[in-house]
Swiss-Prot record:
Assembly description: Homohexamer; trimer of dimers.
BP-aspect Gene Ontology terms: Mo-molybdopterin cofactor biosynthetic process
Protein name: Cyclic pyranopterin monophosphate synthase
InterPro entries found in the cross-reference section: MoaC (IPR023045), MoaC_bact/euk (IPR047594), MoaC_sf (IPR036522), MoCo_biosynth_MoaA/MoaC (IPR050105), Mopterin_CF_biosynth-C_dom (IPR002820)
Enzyme class: lyase
Length: 160
């Protein structure tokens, strides 16, 4: 892996990296986020008793949509033909909802940003739908857990 930043041109100005010479490979990225809240807020999400509707269903769709639109909101991301997006939720304890996003493609560049965007927007959607009853919710940490495929090789958080 190189320490050289590739998103700058010879004038030291931002540019989108040219991936035209890269090989097409299967690429998968997994990101995680979480949102912490009052126990009664999480209980109401679990029971489907939030006024705005089914929080997890809406957050799941928002996460999928966000992954598909990542290239439109992150300036140097390439538009990618995503082949799979999965958003999953887990009730970690009485105050924490974990969100995992898996994004797949077969292409010349990875889908790390799409996975990170997906879980971030899913968490923001949970916040939006529950803020009337709990303004003290905290989002994060958000992190890339793994990525496979591509020239830089595989990454799995916690492995050296």
């Amino acid at each position: 892996m190189t320490d050289q930043l590739t998103h700058f041109n010879e004038q030291n100005r931002a540019r989108m990296v040219d991936v035209s010479e890269k090989d097409v490979t299967k690429r998968v990225a997994v990101a995680e986020s979480q949102i912490s809240m009052k126990p009664e807020t999480l209980a109401r999400i679990r029971e489907g008793r939030i006024e705005k509707g089914d929080v997890l269903a809406v957050a799941q769709v928002a996460g999928v949509m966000a992954a598909k639109k990542t290239w439109e909101i992150i300036p140097m991301c390439h538009p990618l033909p995503l082949t799979g997006i999965d958003i999953q939720f887990a009730f970690e304890d009485e105050t924490t909802l974990a969100i995992t996003g898996t994004v797949k493609t077969t292409g010349k560049t990875g889908v790390e940003m799409e996975a990170l965007t997906a879980v971030s927007v899913a968490a923001l959607t949970v916040y939006d739908m529950c803020k009337a009853m709990d303004k003290e919710m905290i989002i994060g940490p958000t992190s890339l857990q793994s990525k496979t495929g591509g020239k830089s090789g595989d990454f799995h958080r916690g492995e050296k």
